[in-house]
Design a protein with these regions (language model features):
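An anionic, glycine-rich sequence signature occurring as long contiguous blocks
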Residues: 2-16, 252-356, 411, 441-445
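Catalytic cores of alpha/beta
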Residues: 240-244
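Short, solvent-exposed helix-loop connector elements
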Residues: 50-57, 332-339, 355-371, 387-398, ...
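Conserved nucleotidyltransferase catalytic core and NTase-mimicking acidic/glycine-rich helix/loop elements
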Residues: 73, 385-411
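Acidic, metal-coordinating catalytic cores used for nucleic-acid/nucleotide bond scission
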Residues: 231-239, 259-261
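Short amphipathic alpha-helical "interface-anchor" segments enriched in bulky aromatics
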Residues: 36, 83, 159, 277, ...
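Dynamic "connector" segments at or just before major functional cores
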Residues: 1-207, 213-224, 246-249, 393, ...
Length: 445
C-alpha cells in the first residue's frame, strides 16, 4: 500500500530558549494609544482638573496613577497587581516617559486619596475630552447627528457584585446572586457612538431610578445647546418626576411602561392590525393615560403579538404585549422597533463590564472605587473615540477585538542616532487597520 505524506506539516524543529532579548514588548499597539492621549493633553488635563498635589517627597502624583490604571485597563487588567505587571514592561515605560513605575500597593494607596470632588472632576474630564474628539471628527467629515441635531441617549443600570467587605457595597437588586452585596452603577450611552456620556458609581441598595432626575441634569449639561436629547430606557425609569423634568427641558423620551394594572389597561384599548400580510398576528394601539401620581396624562403606545389560541366554548387568544410612554411622533410598531435598538445598550454595558472590566479593580474604600470606575470609563471611551476617528472596520469592533488586533502587537524598541524606533512584524493580521489607527493617533487636535 502506497504511503501518503502531507507536505504542509514538517517535523517540529528543536528550539532552545534564551532570556537575553532586550527592548521586546507584547503591547506595541499601546504606542498609538499613548500618542492619542498625548495629543489630548491627557496627563496635563487630569493634573489641572484634580488640583491634587501629593507631598513634596512623593515620587508619583495622582495623575500618574490615573494614566497607569487607564493604560492597564486598556490592556485587560482586572486587578491592581495586573496593572503593575503591565507597567513592568520596560518598553512601555520608555514609550510613556517613565523610568520606574510604582508597585500595586503604592497605586492602591494613591487612589485611596480620592474624594467626591476628585470623582466629579474626572466625570467632567470625560466631557472635555469628548468635545475635542467630536470637533475633530466633524472637521474631518464624519457626520455626527449627536453633535449636530438629535442624540438618542440610552440609560441603564448594572449590578456589580463584590466579595468581602467593601465600603458602599450593599444588598439590593441582584438577579445573578441574590443576597450578595454589590454596587449599582448608573450609565448613559450615546447610541450613535457607543461611548459613555455620563456615569455614576452607586451603592448596591440604590433603586434603578434613584437620582434619575439629577443624573439627567448632569447628562444634559454635557450636551451641546440646540441638540435634542431623546432618552430611551427600560421600565425601571418609568417615573413621573423624570418625565416631568424631560418635558420641562424640551427633551424626548421612549420608556417602557411598568404598571400593576397594565394588562387590564391594554385590554380596554382599540387594537388595529399592523399589516396582515407582512406581520400576521401583530396589532397596535395608541391612547392617553394619566397615572395616579402624575399631574397630567401622557401618550402611551402599545403593540401585541398573537402567540396562541385556545379553542373552547369561548375562543381565548393569548398575546405578548409591549407598552411604552413617549413624546415621539412614531407609530406604535415603529416605536417598538426603535426601542428594540436599545438591546445594544445592554451589550455595551456588558462590553464595558466584562471587556473593559469597569468596576473590577477595587479597594476597600468607596471613593477610591468610584475613581477607579471612572478610570475604566475613560479607558473605554478612549478606545471608542480612537475607533470613531479611525473609521472603517475599526469603528464596528468591540473592545476585545481592538485589544486582540491593535493593542497586542509584538514589537522591539531600538535606538540609533538619538531616535527611538518601535519595530513591528513585517506582516501581521489587520496591518492596514493598524496603520490607519497609528496615523490617526499622530494627528493634532
Amino acid at each position: 500500500m502506497k504511503k501518503i505524506t502531507c507536505g504542509a506539516k514538517k517535523k517540529q524543529p528543536k528550539i532552545k530558549t534564551e532570556m537575553t532579548g532586550k527592548g521586546l514588548t507584547v503591547h506595541g499597539g499601546l504606542l498609538p494609544v499613548l500618542n492619542f492621549m498625548d495629543k489630548l493633553y491627557f496627563f496635563k488635563a487630569v493634573e489641572t482638573a484634580l488640583h491634587k498635589q501629593r507631598g513634596a517627597n512623593a515620587k508619583y502624583q495622582f495623575a500618574d496613577a490615573v494614566q497607569m490604571i487607564v493604560i492597564g485597563v486598556i490592556t485587560g487588567a482586572t486587578a491592581m497587581t495586573q496593572v503593575a505587571a503591565v507597567w513592568a514592561d520596560d518598553v512601555l515605560r520608555r514609550m510613556a516617559g517613565y523610568e520606574k513605575t510604582p508597585v500595586d500597593t503604592s497605586l492602591g494607596r494613591i487612589m485611596k486619596e480620592a474624594s467626591y470632588r476628585d470623582v466629579t472632576a474626572m466625570e467632567g474630564l470625560i466631557h472635555r475630552f469628548r468635545t475635542k474628539v467630536w470637533k475633530r471628527a466633524v472637521r474631518s467629515g464624519t457626520y455626527l447627528k449627536s453633535a449636530m441635531s438629535v442624540m438618542w441617549l440610552d440609560v441603564d443600570s448594572t449590578v456589580d457584585g463584590v466579595f468581602g467587605k467593601q465600603e458602599g457595597a450593599a444588598k439590593g437588586y441582584n438577579p445573578g446572586k441574590k443576597g450578595q452585596e454589590s454596587y449599582h452603577p448608573l450609565m448613559g450611552f450615546v447610541s450613535e457612538t457607543k461611548e459613555v456620556l455620563h456615569s455614576w458609581f452607586r451603592t448596591g441598595s440604590a433603586y434603578t431610578s434613584n437620582g434619575a432626575v439629577e443624573f439627567m441634569k448632569e447628562c444634559l449639561a454635557r450636551i451641546k445647546k440646540g441638540v435634542k436629547v431623546i432618552v430611551r430606557a427600560d421600565s425601571g425609569f418609568f417615573d413621573g418626576s423624570l418625565l416631568d423634568y424631560l418635558e420641562a427641558t424640551c427633551s424626548g423620551y421612549l420608556i417602557k411602561v411598568k404598571l400593576k394594572n397594565l394588562n387590564a389597561l391594554l385590554e380596554r384599548q382599540i387594537w388595529k392590525a399592523i399589516d396582515s400580510k407582512k406581520l400576521p398576528g401583530w396589532e397596535q394601539a395608541e391612547f392617553e393615560y394619566k397615572c395616579t401620581t402624575w399631574s397630567k396624562s401622557r401618550k402611551f403606545i402599545a403593540v401585541r403579538q398573537l402567540i396562541g389560541i385556545e379553542q373552547g366554548l369561548i375562543e381565548l387568544r393569548e398575546y405578548q404585549s409591549f407598552c411604552y410612554v413617549t413624546t415621539e411622533n412614531l407609530t406604535p410598531y415603529a416605536a417598538h422597533k426603535k426601542y428594540g435598538e436599545r438591546a445594544t445598550c445592554e451589550t455595551w454595558i456588558e462590553e464595558c463590564k466584562t471587556q473593559m472590566n469597569a468596576g473590577h479593580i477595587r479597594t476597600s474604600e468607596f471613593w477610591a472605587n468610584s475613581a477607579l470606575f471612572q478610570c475604566a470609563i475613560l479607558a473605554y471611551n478612549l478606545l471608542k473615540w480612537m475607533a470613531l476617528l479611525t473609521g472603517g472596520a475599526v469603528r464596528q469592533w468591540e473592545i476585545k477585538t481592538m485589544r486582540l488586533w491593535l493593542i497586542r502587537v509584538a514589537g522591539k524598541l531600538t535606538e540609533g542616532g538619538r531616535q527611538l524606533t518601535l519595530k513591528l512584524p513585517r506582516r501581521f493580521l489587520h496591518q492596514e487597520e493598524w496603520q490607519l489607527w497609528e496615523r490617526m493617533s499622530l494627528t493634532i487636535f
